[in-house]
């Protein structure tokens, strides 16, 4: 089934074990007839919200998550700059979790949109005052960076995959099924393709990974890198 998810702004792939791989429209839900059959759902994106959160992390000098590298083409705080306070770091991490996997990390209080970030940043109405004050001066630069990075992802995926972006995932699942001798269990995976300064793939949530854009464009290397992720979930 050909890809039909215009401009790759969000790639959503699903499979019933009796169907060919294909793209699920952004608001599509599974057909009730497939409820009892194993199926998988993969969403690939370079989410502007995720990019904004990481840009703010870098601009504020926040170190968590410690294993995530810096973003390319975005200023890194000077070594002698004052580090973010533990309070801001904690509040940012909670905001990060809500951004990456909002269903798994619901806010305990109402959320409020932050001025200057359009609808891309929402923080708890109470308990995030320090973070709110810290990020406000960086709104314009973080938004500009995130939107530019997202546009480059869209252009790159359109030009390099030729409409076959799903094949890397389908191949990894098929190889997993051959190795273990069974169908893959039903699972969900979110993939964020990001302009990291280091090449690799990192878990950023229970059902979410971040992959460097350079690795994603390398068909052979990405196929090898995504297989352990598929095996973990399937």
Language model region names:
Residues 90, 94, 98-101, 174, ...:
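Charged/polar, solvent-exposed surface patches and flexible loops
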């Amino acid at each position: 089934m050909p890809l039909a998810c215009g401009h790759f702004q969000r790639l959503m792939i699903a499979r019933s074990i009796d169907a060919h791989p294909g793209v699920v429209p952004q608001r599509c839900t599974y057909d009730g007839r497939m409820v009892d059959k194993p199926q998988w759902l993969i969403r690939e994106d370079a989410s502007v919200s995720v990019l904004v959160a990481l840009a703010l992390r870098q601009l504020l000098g926040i170190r968590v998550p410690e294993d995530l590298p810096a973003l390319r083409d975005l200023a890194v705080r000077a070594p002698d700059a004052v580090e973010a306070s533990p309070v801001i770091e904690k509040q940012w991490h909670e905001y990060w979790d809500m951004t990456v996997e909002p269903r798994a990390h619901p806010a305990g209080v109402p959320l409020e949109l932050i001025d200057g970030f359009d609808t891309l940043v929402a923080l708890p109405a109470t308990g995030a005052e320090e973070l709110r004050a810290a990020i406000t001066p960086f709104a314009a630069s973080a938004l500009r960076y995130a939107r530019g990075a997202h546009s480059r992802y869209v252009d790159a995926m359109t030009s390099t995959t030729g409409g076959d972006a799903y094949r890397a995932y389908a191949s990894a699942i098929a190889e997993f099924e051959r190795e273990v001798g069974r169908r893959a269990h039903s699972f969900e995976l979110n993939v964020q393709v990001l302009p990291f300064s280091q090449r690799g793939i990192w878990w950023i949530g229970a059902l979410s990974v971040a992959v460097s854009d350079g690795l994603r464009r390398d068909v052979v290397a990405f196929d090898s890198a995504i297989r352990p992720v598929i095996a973990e979930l399937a």
